[in-house]
Amino acid sequence: MRTLNVALGDRAYPIHIGPGVLDNAGLIRPFLRTARVAIVTNDVVGPLYLARLQRALEADGVRVDVVTLPDGESHKNWQTLNLVFDMLLATRCERSTTLIALGGGVVGDMAGFAAATYQRGMPFIQVPTTLLSQVDSSVGGKTAINHPLGKNMIGAFYQPRVVLADTATLDTLPDRELKAGLAEVIKYGLIRDPALFDWLEAHIERVLAREPEALAFAIERSCANKAEVVAADETEQGERALLNLGHTFGHAIETGMGYGNWLHGEAVAAGTMMAAELSRRLGWLSAADVARIEALHVRAGLPVLGPPLPVATYLELMANDKKVEEGRLRLVLLRSIGKAVLHAGAAPDVIGASIEARCG
């Protein structure tokens, strides 16, 4: 097991990474205010891992209540969130009860938002079970649900008490989900860690083959990058915005195509290629670097072209992005592999041409 730390002063918390951490109640118990938890999971992850987590906690004297949500991005909404509140109220959970998210990014985002708002805040623990949630969404305290007009538009910053990333849960992860998670790993290499990008170019097939050492390295290196950024800029006033490389385009894809039709990582991959193309057109990124970025995404089994939505639809959806400031669209772009910038000066016609060049 490897432990990293998210340095947020008196709200600092550890990230425990390794096989079997799910079964170790001793990693959870110190962070409980009382001997009571409520677990939020879904109908895919629950049958695989709920009994193990519940058994470990109950053996340690902890009372466990559970709510199982329907799986998928299409359910990340008020209606599903209310199922969590229904359980918390029906079982008389208190402000001191700890909410545990057992699942991928959708479960973590919704459980975290429930924890942030139930009785104005209850303790929260992340147990991510997908590659994407282990390397990205479980760390940093972003919680949200979707709105028909935009992804993650209703939410809060709310940090977990501890993150348990059990790498053995990736053994049951579908190949498509594994590949989608790699989009976020590649992102860290592109925005701030060129050595990670080089490593991925050399070892991407090992990660796809789920070699334990390669997976562990990719997860640990990604979490270390995320932890550093979050510690420096918790509420996304500066550097943390760079973690959104590809996300402005990607969220437009997810919203425009209907939540769940494109996985988040797939949309981020296509969005990253749009950002790379725009960076090239602005004279920042060389054609050779764009080709390297595309080649790595292709080897990872990720899309490098977005869906053929009208450019006007992309731009309309992107106008709802959370990084828009005073009506100006701010995009995360690349000066080089390993150096990202937040840029608000790109002309709409150049943005549109970049989108058009990267639509299938």
From Swiss-Prot:
Gene Ontology molecular function, alphabetical: 3-dehydroquinate synthase activity; metal ion binding; nucleotide binding
Catalyzed chemical reaction(s): 7-phospho-2-dehydro-3-deoxy-D-arabino-heptonate = 3-dehydroquinate + phosphate
Cellular location(s): Cytoplasm
Cofactor note as given: Binds 1 divalent metal cation per subunit. Can use either Co(2+) or Zn(2+).
Major place of residence: cytoplasm
Alphabetical list of HAMAP family matching this protein: DHQ_synthase
Coiled coil: none
Pathway(s) of this molecule: Metabolic intermediate biosynthesis; chorismate biosynthesis; chorismate from D-erythrose 4-phosphate and phosphoenolpyruvate: step 2/7
Name of the molecule in the record: 3-dehydroquinate synthase
Gene Ontology annotations for the cellular component aspect, listed alphabetically: cytoplasm
GO biological process: amino acid biosynthetic process; aromatic amino acid family biosynthetic process; chorismate biosynthetic process
Top-level taxon of the source organism: Bacteria
Organism of this sequence: Aromatoleum aromaticum (strain DSM 19018 / LMG 30748 / EbN1)
Function: Catalyzes the conversion of 3-deoxy-D-arabino-heptulosonate 7-phosphate (DAHP) to dehydroquinate (DHQ).
Enzyme class: lyase
E.C. number(s) listed in UniProt: 4.2.3.4
Family: Belongs to the sugar phosphate cyclases superfamily. Dehydroquinate synthase family.
Keywords for this protein: Amino-acid biosynthesis, Aromatic amino acid biosynthesis, Cobalt, Cytoplasm, Lyase, Metal-binding, NAD, Nucleotide-binding, Zinc
Names of required cofactors: Co(2+); Zn(2+); NAD(+)
Binding locations of Zn(2+): 184, 247, 264
Binding site for NAD(+): 71-76, 105-109, 129-130, 142, 151, 169-172
